[in-house]
UniProtKB/Swiss-Prot annotation:
Record organism: Arabidopsis thaliana (Mouse-ear cress)
Reactions mediated catalytically: Ca(2+)(in) + ATP + H2O = Ca(2+)(out) + ADP + phosphate + H(+)
GO molecular function: ATP binding; ATP hydrolysis activity; metal ion binding; P-type calcium transporter activity
Residues in coiled coil: none
Compartments in which it is found: Membrane
Similarity remark: Belongs to the cation transport ATPase (P-type) (TC 3.A.3) family. Type IIA subfamily.
Keyword field: ATP-binding, Calcium, Calcium transport, Ion transport, Magnesium, Membrane, Metal-binding, Nucleotide-binding, Translocase, Transmembrane, Transmembrane helix, Transport
Protein name per its UniProtKB record: Calcium-transporting ATPase 2, endoplasmic reticulum-type
UniProt-listed Enzyme Commission number(s): 7.2.2.10
PANTHER family: CALCIUM-TRANSPORTING ATPASE
Membrane topology (UniProt): Multi-pass membrane protein
Keyword Cell membrane recorded: no
Gene name as annotated: ECA2
Organismal lineage: Eukaryota, Viridiplantae, Streptophyta, Embryophyta, Tracheophyta
TM ranges: 54-74, 99-118, 263-282, 313-330, 783-802, 813-833, 854-876, 950-969, 983-1001, 1017-1037
Amino acid sequence: MEEEKSFSAWSWSVEQCLKEYKTRLDKGLTSEDVQIRRQKYGFNELAKEKGKPLWHLVLEQFDDTLVKILLGAAFISFVLAFLGEEHGSGSGFEAFVEPFVIVLILILNAVVGVWQESNAEKALEALKEMQCESAKVLRDGNVLPNLPARELVPGDIVELNVGDKVPADMRVSGLKTSTLRVEQSSLTGEAMPVLKGANLVVMDDCELQGKENMVFAGTTVVNGSCVCIVTSIGMDTEIGKIQRQIHEASLEESETPLKKKLDEFGSRLTTAICIVCVLVWMINYKNFVSWDVVDGYKPVNIKFSFEKCTYYFKIAVALAVAAIPEGLPAVITTCLALGTRKMAQKNAIVRKLPSVETLGCTTVICSDKTGTLTTNQMSATEFFTLGGKTTTTRVFSVSGTTYDPKDGGIVDWGCNNMDANLQAVAEICSICNDAGVFYEGKLFRATGLPTEAALKVLVEKMGIPEKKNSENIEEVTNFSDNGSSVKLACCDWWNKRSKKVATLEFDRVRKSMSVIVSEPNGQNRLLVKGAAESILERSSFAQLADGSLVALDESSREVILKKHSEMTSKGLRCLGLAYKDELGEFSDYSSEEHPSHKKLLDPSSYSNIETNLIFVGVVGLRDPPREEVGRAIEDCRDAGIRVMVITGDNKSTAEAICCEIRLFSENEDLSQSSFTGKEFMSLPASRRSEILSKSGGKVFSRAEPRHKQEIVRMLKEMGEIVAMTGDGVNDAPALKLADIGIAMGITGTEVAKEASDMVLADDNFSTIVSAVAEGRSIYNNMKAFIRYMISSNVGEVISIFLTAALGIPECMIPVQLLWVNLVTDGPPATALGFNPADIDIMKKPPRKSDDCLIDSWVLIRYLVIGSYVGVATVGIFVLWYTQASFLGISLISDGHTLVSFTQLQNWSECSSWGTNFTATPYTVAGGLRTIAFENNPCDYFTLGKVKPMTLSLTVLVAIEMFNSLNALSEDNSLLTMPPWRNPWLLVAMTVSFALHCVILYVPFLANVFGIVPLSFREWFVVILVSFPVILIDEALKFIGRCRRTRIKKKIKTM
């Protein structure tokens, strides 16, 4: 197999290829040959990569630090609930609420993760759909018209016809028609169908585009028919190599910047949680283990209380629950989903949620040219003819960049009655042409060759020769309904005037095509269009503006060639136009019955017919840049994002477009910025890295898939965050490898779309820039709500730590903390995702990959705010037990018993207090319920703590609502960034308070969460205790602003 794999079939003659593959054109392979080769090469099908089993995918979802901590907390909570060891937290169903909710969250998270993973490799499935199902094959001297394509082997002789999908990589052995065109844009990125022939290509190391005698699996024959020799099948085909590259790229997929930050944060949080949990448990060791000491150091009479040990262990578990922001994954997912909706409104369809955030830190955009930077609609931008004499030219500029006949026109067109020369231009462009235009999906599209469609649109902009006749065709220029052909009235007028009687098809030798038409005067005329140099070389005369003919001499040829050179330097594709009236034996040709018809069946005779031509003019066409791309390139430059254009087009065209879109300045030296793919790859690795690391734009032309992948891989190794655009099958590996793969929605193949992270509905580069801006805004908002949620959790941790350190009863139980983290915090955190974007968001450089979510100053703020949260929640608990009033507001209106702070600290020793301690019943819910302690006064510190625990929980909720207002802006005061700037946040706060009231005032839920209703007086106390968090953070923001101003001044003076 190695021998065939290394055999460059394109660089060898057909006879040598037949000898190499041991086959014959007249008989094909024998059945015995097929069997032997089948055993050696296998079937012609793409390999099925082994996917991960379901159980493996499920386990992977739990391979996360935070998830492992939650699993541990859930397991311990379940065991303690099952053993009935929960101290003062109820029994039965209520005891299992906490582990049940945690496990439910983890299961939902795993389901989403498995679903995303199982859909990740759809690109490979889409690739398989491109494969051909059957082929017309010659074996044992017999034609098999519908042999299953999977049964092909190297050496098979296959016939291809118009519309056939190529079943394998094959060497063209001969054409059965004058020309053969294959649509291979999905594989190579070439915009137009490619001419194929049987002549060898004298290059062993040849680009895919240069293999003009090869047809590739998955491409389609659009014109002509041929006979081919199968050279590669299955995974050895070009499409097979792409599948292998997609698979390898998927293995190289790295985590998104945010995922890395969250993992890093998770690891640090794990360490902190373990330390604090152990510390909390150890602080209270005297409450569950005691001993006497003899001889100064020997412990005796050791007493151990398993009940109290598990109780304080439960507190440690509660601390873990408090420290972990359980609602964070859900809020992040919600924020990203909201971001996708915003992007969809801007024509950016996000397929993978994490890519929304990754867009925000993009540092390099690698963009294709065709269809992304350009319109992917060929248009004539200028044409020239000779003037009144052979030494002058007339140049006409044409506006409009689409196939819409009414898009633009000919600039300063004063030819209401066209002269003979311009009439010849219009006649050739409209009749020597097989293309058309149709209207679909609010877009004008071409049928046939794009260049020919552009010529027909040019004719519509020119109008018809006589002004008086234009009134008769004006009404029919309106296009029909969606999906139908567009009526090209001017072209129809020319086609009715001059009837086409024969076509001389294009071939690559003469580089032209022509038609014989019957003119109104009864004479035949040959209309020719083709490569401008080739047309000029075969022209003997030229037509002047008045229609007169003059012989072409050297000076007039120089004038034409100079103008042609100017046009090509602008990146225009130039087509020469000519005609011929003296047709000899074809002067009266009218049908296939004509005696000279045999000559028209022989393409080798066409070049003799197309001689002594009359030169008419040259039309310059191009795929024009989108109008908005130049502005988008400048936005990228302002935002610190580098743009690199990677295209399959030739170097001069690519450079011209890049200069026009202002990627390069007009007189910029491009020697270090513009390379062909082959030139770049031939450089040493160190030199390539140096080129890629330099600032400014880059353009890589004639780039192959492997070149794109290598450029992306090198950029990623340099620490860049790379966005890559593509539309073809050949782009799929690079799309998969890039941090952000962006496929084209209009021109993109299904393979490219499935391999991408995002699809552009309008194929427009400026949409990428808008998406980057949205990604940056989303990241800033995510940072706001992450900081908000973490600061809330720090407060919860400090609250539990203070409870344990002071030795008082726990003021909140795990299920309450879980409710706060998941439900109460959720709406405000999500609403912070709606914060308006900063005005200068695209004036700042991309954030660095090592940019911290939490820097030292933010950490100090967390600790200060968290400390207040802890003091407030524990303080209200202590106040209820020990104080009769707070700021003049009575706390004992419910009739509860006051105790000293010392008693509260030593509540676990209550049983030893004897009859000295009694607890009177107190009322809740406006006197509708009484909590009594008749059997055991010590229950006052367990069952009786339901009211102070409710106060602590409500203070925590209220503080976190006020703290969400602080998160509106990282540095700006609420005076400059008022809450109504984000009305969704006010709605979310209302929802969270409403949810809290539901669990307070619905008896069943109140029992589940171990709380009771509060009175109006108690709510007033809650607000008084909670509101200062806003004043504290305002002071911290002021200090932060002063600190930043001081740093800026210091930098300026350095």
